[in-house]
Amino acid sequence: MELGLANKTALVTGGSKGIGLETARALAREGVKVLVCARRESALADAARDIMRTTQAKIEVHPLDVTKVEQIETIPRIITDKLGRIDILVNNAGTGTYKPFLEVTDEELVEGMAINFFAQFRICQRIVPMMIAQGGGRIVNVSGQTGIMTLNPPFLSSCTGPAKSAEIRFSKVLANELAPHNIRVNCVIPGFINTPERFAKWERELAKRQLSPEDAARERSLWSSNQGVRDTRWGTPEEIANLIVFAVSDAASYINGAELVADNAMDKS
């Protein structure tokens, strides 16, 4: 299958680890010149070395906090300086808050929207004019399964779910609006992906809730025994990266405005 990605350029947010890192690696293998953005410079440096080691491709990096509007404003200049043009945008940065509805703080609610939906909206708004000016482009917004289904404890998502749903709806609206400009927009919705960062995040959430040692141990047993996932297995970042690469390739030229769910049939609806 010819993907037609050689010599294209791409920006991947949240690209220093997990799905973002593997997406940057997979794009680099296809001959794409990749710019990876994430918050921590040390993590970006590690990602660049890792991708160079496995692909012999040099990637560009730039620190970026997608919750800071003033930093998002600099993206067009960064792209021009480091890539020259922008063919592909992968909006991967995001996170989740998993706690009971009545325990979610207003700060967590605002942060959840800012790092997920607001960031994707704002970044697209800065990059789309560049794509229109150059004649087209491809965008993938990465959402999550809490945007399409309600999960079992401990994966409580009253805060994260609405933000992820907004990303999905935004992708569909944008696909329709930008189709006349030769810009395709799709939304990739991963299921449970097994990364060290996911479990570290849940540990931080547990610490915030100040559970008893017994209750904390009970919640950890749900993670490790897969009871929260029921009859399906955990996916890998590489599997989601492969889907993203396909979605931005010439092989997916008729796929636009799609919800691309990769969850091993976890969602039975």
What kind of feature is each model-predicted range?
Residues 140-166, 171-180, 192-193:
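Catalytic loop of short-chain dehydrogenase/reductase
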Residues 129, 176-177, 253:
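Alpha-helical segment proximal to the catalytic Tyr-Lys
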Residues 100-101, 108-113, 225:
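Substrate-binding pocket helix/loop in short-chain dehydrogenase/reductase
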Residues 3-35:
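Canonical Rossmann dinucleotide-binding motif of NAD(H)/NADP(H)-dependent dehydrogenases/reductases
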Residues 30-46:
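Conserved glycine-rich Rossmann-like NAD(P)H-binding loop of the short-chain dehydrogenase/reductase
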Residues 19, 244-245, 256-269:
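Short C-terminal tail/terminal secondary-structure segment
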Residues 179, 184, 255-257:
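Short, small/polar-rich loop/turn modules that mediate ligand/substrate recognition or access, typified
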